[in-house]
């Protein structure tokens, strides 16, 4: 196992003996450097993309990586661009909140998002154009967002957060449902502990910065729809961005009071929520006669593809 690791996190990852080698970088953009690519090539490496890599590198940079990338590196452009993301989700017939074209069109509560994998930092809610402008200006002053940064406005969907993680195997042509998690965001979750009177006096724009994840087990009656959504997404991805949605991905949304799911995001690679199932998820325990984490599942797919000389099916 080779870990491409930011220098600031070296001390942490040196603690784990299963990591055979660390490639230290100041930024994941250095994956493109000849020295890094040479090391990966000499070890016949397959690069596993994650959220920080997507956040730090442009789509063009990711697509120019010469090391084989697990999954579909082309679909990461669709994850990073809000307009393209919405197009793919609609192609997959996922139920979605309506987008709002401009601040002038805000008629109800909306959530305003940044492009790419920002981890929720810089997101904010608004109920009118005036509210939007006030909060945007405040975040610019606080240097959380930049003045020329494009923002995406979407009607706010209320309900129980549920992040649905899947794995699609092109070797077996089969979709697997891995598990569900919830993300805990600061400081929006902490507001519930503050009395309403004090909340009204506060001028601070609440943040949606993701701090951690916790497991969730869905009602069994919801699982059939979960599989259908995952299968529809895989089919849509094959039509829209070849070779499709191979490997891990996540459909993110909420369940309302009628247990109806609304999806507001997707991630086309491994997500942090899979960390809570390092010893296997409840659903994977029904599919595999062994503990199976998402990392182990990816490694198993690479091993099987290598044995059958089909690495081209699982990498780009």
Model-derived segments and their meaning:
Residues 1-7:
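Short internal beta-strands
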Residues 3, 74-160, 167-182, 219-231:
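Active-site nucleotide/adenylate-binding loops and adjacent lid/helix of ATP-dependent enzymes
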Residues 10-107, 118:
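Conserved N-proximal alpha/beta basic substrate-recognition cap immediately N-terminal to
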Residues 109-113, 165-166, 259-270:
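A short beta-strand motif that forms the metal-chelation/ATP-contact edge
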Residues 154, 165, 241-258:
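A short glycine-rich, hydrophobically flanked beta-strand micro-motif that places a catalytic Asp/Glu
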Residues 166-237, 267-295, 299:
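ATP-dependent carboxylate/phosphate-activation module, predominantly the ATP-grasp catalytic core
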Residues 173-176, 251-252, 259-265:
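Conserved active-site beta-strand-loop modules that form the wall/rim of enzyme catalytic pockets
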Residues 295-316:
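Cysteine/selenocysteine-centered motifs that mediate thiol-based redox chemistry or coordinate metal-sulfur cofactors
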